Amino acid sequence: MAKDTSYDAVMDRRAEIMSRALGLNYDEFIISDIAFDYEGMMAKAGYSLEEVRQIQSESGVGNTPLLELRNITDLARKTSKRGFGARILIKDEAANPSGSFKDRRASVSIHHAKKLGYPGVLAATSGNYGAAVASQAAMKNLGCIIVQEVFDSRHVGQPEIIEKSRKCEAYGAEVVQLTVGPELFYVSLILLEETGYFNASLYSPFGISGVETLGYELVEQIRARYDKDPAYIVVTHAGGGNVTGTARGALKAGAKNSTIIGASVDLSGLHMASDNDFNKKSFTTGHTGFGVPFATWPDRTDVPKNAARPLRYLDRYVTVTQGEVFYVTEALAQVEGMERGPAGNTSLAAAIALARELPEDEIVVVQETEYTGAGKHPWAQLDFAKQNGIAVKRGAPKENKPGKTIVIPQNFSQITATEMDLNRMRRSYIRNALERNKVKNVTEEDIRFLAEDTKTDADFVTSVIRDLGVRL
């Protein structure tokens, strides 16, 4: 008898489908409605750092170059007060097989799928991760399906996303293209059930453990060359896996005093699931449309408990404008001779501003570059923005209005980073944890977990809970 594939029926079966597609029983880590054993989940489901390094070495992933951006550092110093302007370094993750750090994330999932005997892998993604999964699956001779949100209801798609679809197909993947909306998860569940494929989720412990090598490597490389740890590690932040994995790796390397700073493109006011807003943004990842909601409620993904938990690790969170990232993309190419895409250049734009805060003998490291899709060339995305009624001009970045105006800076001194209120986001996360789980009474175990999950303490959590009127 054929299974009921109506939306409600598939959603009712999602726990069963996900358990089979990951080979992981999340129930054993649950402590309460709020708390779960995060480190226990990472230890049991993931691989050790040395095991991951071996897995990645076998598939050509990792050990990417660490480059000093001397010319960009000089420009940052010229726009800093005397004696300030930290050295800016960048981890050239574009050297990975598919052109981004996502190869690290995909490598462990695909290795695990092969080890467990799955016939293939599936990933729901807008771009870079799909290319990484397809590339790694090709190496392991596994089937691969990539499910992408590509179009709005007019069937119009952004150049960057369409180019990344082509890249996935070039690696031999079957690409299922969807319009924006709630069907992404639904279609993914149906395909997982039909094919028996492994869910190469961005948010599983396998994916996050794959990124830990990035944080570990960059600390090792900086110590070997400069005999010190970086003052700031700047990470492009979207769904939280980049921040989580990089920070965990840096901590495992012993870099306890390095400040972890997330950076996102400011797309405030645009709704990521809105058909109307879908093509009004010029960035498909690394923006606040993912960065804020995934930080304030990480368990909104295709796994029961998200291994990407950015508030556990973020010390600061800043935003830059679309125009600033486009400007820095051009600067990196013309000043440093490196043509790279917007994901890494988001954190580079922030790093330029952040470097001005520190003395010249300190180090700011940007932990990724990427080289995939049309997004590495600003003109395709800017032309597309104009076609969708967005004004593009030169001027002051503060004039940027997401969905209306993209303002390209006129000079280097105009690049700034806007601080986000992390405590406000932490309070929002705690409220979501209580309300979404319908919690009426909070236990000491819940308070301990929430303090760890927000990088705060019991007093902070207790104060927020009392403000919400929940019984302790």
UniProtKB/Swiss-Prot annotation:
Highest taxon listed in the record's lineage: Bacteria
Catalytic reaction list: D-alanine + acetyl-CoA = (2R)-2-amino-4-oxopentanoate + CoA
Originating organism: Unknown prokaryotic organism
EC number: 2.3.1.263
Keyword line: Pyridoxal phosphate, Transferase
CC cofactor: pyridoxal 5'-phosphate
GO BP, one annotated term: ornithine metabolic process
Binding locations of pyridoxal 5'-phosphate: N128, A238, G239, G240, G241, N242
Name under which the protein is recorded: 2-amino-4-ketopentanoate thiolase beta subunit
Cited InterPro entries: AKP_thiolase_beta, Cys_Synth/Cystath_Beta-Synth, TrpB-like_PALP, TrpB-like_PALP_sf
Top EC class, one word: transferase
Encoding gene (name): ortB
Subunit structure: Heterodimer with OrtA.
Annotated GO MF terms: acetyl-CoA C-acetyltransferase activity
Main function: Involved in the ornithine fermentation pathway. Catalyzes the thiolytic cleavage of 2-amino-4-ketopentanoate (AKP) with coenzyme A (CoA) to form acetyl-CoA and alanine. It is strictly specific for AKP.
Modified-residue entries (N6-(pyridoxal phosphate)lysine), positions: K102
The family this protein is said to belong to: Belongs to the threonine synthase family.
